[in-house]
Design a protein with these regions (language model features):
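Penicillin-recognizing serine hydrolase domain
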Residues: 16-74, 131-277
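Active-site SXXK
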Residues: 80-105, 118, 246
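Conserved catalytic neighborhood of penicillin-recognizing serine enzymes
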Residues: 101-150
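Short, histidine-centered active-site or binding-site loop motifs used for metal coordination
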Residues: 96, 122, 250-252
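Secretory targeting and sorting signals
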Residues: 1-20
Length: 277
């Protein structure tokens, strides 16, 4: 109920109707799932990114929010828990900016650069600094509460931020709601950093896989990779393609190398059409 009231209060303009020329999310998810080779598990979630507006009655806003929610789709693994790897950096960035915006913390001089590097270059030391500085576990809990993310939780081992848990449907919900839950300037910053993702990460890992390997230039993306929690290798990719949010979370056996995992995730991402002109 809290989320419904929140969505109604910001008076959404986006709705769940398919954009002309785009397949419906329920049609797209099976295509993406089928394009993933049998190397591991792929979770897929697709949603429409929402935008704030004005001029709707409460009833109309609630109806529109319901259509947006109904338009989201996922495969059988969309609600399965995965270690976040670097996806948690999105939560950290949003919560640091939110707490600074609401007067709950004062940004230090180096924080803006750390936040940007953490998203654009997937900089792990930057993430670790912010995690320790501002209580990362608390940040994950706070974001999960404010966005209604039921499958998202901090890591069991303190400090191991990449082992926080989330689901594809939670990440899709987060990116869908970002423009209407976060302050517009904060949402714009996060999405701008995602659009400016660097081909090589801070640690030298090539980020051009999954959605970053197939979506049009300038697409807002975030990549994640990690080995080897529970004997598995994880490779994740999320993006906002036009007005569509796409989340791909993958898990392969440790014996499957990054090259094969990257190729598999990129194959799945290639099934997603570009946005209409």
């Amino acid at each position: 109920m809290l989320v419904v009231v929140l969505l109604a209060s910001v008076l959404l303009l986006a709705d769940g109707r398919a954009v002309a020329g785009e397949p419906h999310a329920a049609e797209l998810v099976p295509r993406v799932t089928a394009a993933y080779p049998p190397v591991g598990t792929l979770a897929v979630a697709v949603a429409r990114q929402q935008v704030p507006g004005s001029g709707l009655s409460l009833r109309a806003a609630e109806a529109r929010a319901a259509r947006v929610a109904a338009a989201a789709a996922g495969n059988a693994a969309a609600g399965r828990s995965f270690p976040t790897a670097s996806m948690v950096k999105l939560f950290v960035a949003e919560d640091v900016l939110h707490r600074a915006r609401t007067g709950r913390l004062v940004l230090r001089p180096d924080d803006p650069a750390l936040l940007e590097d953490m998203i654009r270059r997937s900089d792990d030391p930057a993430a670790s600094t912010l995690w320790v500085r501002y209580d990362g576990a608390r940040m994950v809990v706070d974001v999960a509460r404010r966005y209604g993310l039921e499958g998202t939780a901090p890591p069991d081992v303190p400090g191991q931020w990449g082992q926080a848990l989330t689901t594809a449907q939670d990440l899709a919900r987060f990116l869908s709601l970002l423009p209407v839950v976060a302050h517009p300037d904060d949402a714009a910053s996060i999405l701008a950093w995602m659009r400016a993702a660097t081909p090589l990460a801070a640690d030298g890992f090539d980020q051009r896989f999954g959605l970053f390997g197939t979506a049009p230039s300038g697409t807002a993306v975030k990549q994640g990779w990690m080995c080897c929690v529970g004997g598995s290798r994880h490779l994740h990719s999320v993006g906002v393609i036009g007005s569509r949010v796409v989340v791909l979370l993958s898990e392969v056996p440790r014996s499957t190398g990054y090259a094969a995992a990257r190729a598999a995730l990129t194959s799945a991402a290639a099934a997603i059409p570009p946005p209409p002109p």
